């Protein structure tokens, strides 16, 4: 049993909860997710099973797309709807569509972001949420993130009321805290705010429409069709930069052979496939030998390499 399961993560569960439940359903210990989703967030959660856990780090590095809602008028301890109210300031003016779009444009591109106190980022060996639960606030490391697209989905021309909400879609780099983006939007508009709703609609090439629920997974297990829920390792990696090697090279890859970057691929890592369209290994640029590639992960053993 191996491959990638595209789970439609339900609300109220942590990513670790999802792993624990899937281990029980599939009776498989080797399971890992490819990027944490907060309990309040639903949507795409790719989960690696069996030998596919070797490729989890590469799927984690992909860009993510979310659709969500920002509410202006009050902020919370957790920056989302689950936290306690910290500050209240009613929206005492009309906010125009143009204003919101200008704020989203200002937050597009390469920006800096400070992770929220209620997050799993570690400071001095401790997770930030551990400090937060103890009532302590510590200095947090600022991180650089990339917002590829940030668009307003709400069609209204003006927003008014004591508390106002509007919907958005954002495509961003790994490590982006979307709830912090919601707070940043409020700051630029002059009001406390929080993220009132969020769903991840895509993680790299994986989209929400292709995800399945726990109930569907259990049904496939009961029907003896569990293999149908998996995306193969080869397919999961097929969209990444790729080299194809001959049989002679394929035999040597298991021993960690270096490869020439003949295609001059500039991406941080390169998948290496054989002529039967099997992914043999994942390579990266050699730090000391320009133009050469060295293996990061070898995905096949000796027996599997016999062609």
UniProtKB/Swiss-Prot annotation:
InterPro entries, per the entry: PsdUridine_synth_cat_dom_sf (IPR020103), PsdUridine_synth_N (IPR002501), tRNA_psdUridine_synth_TruB (IPR014780), TruB_C (IPR032819)
Enzyme's top EC category: isomerase
GO biological process, one term: tRNA pseudouridine synthesis
Organism encoding this protein: Bacillus cereus (strain ATCC 10987 / NRS 248)
Coiled-coil annotated residue ranges, if any: none
EC assignment: 5.4.99.25
Keywords, alphabetical: Isomerase, tRNA processing
Record protein name field: tRNA pseudouridine synthase B
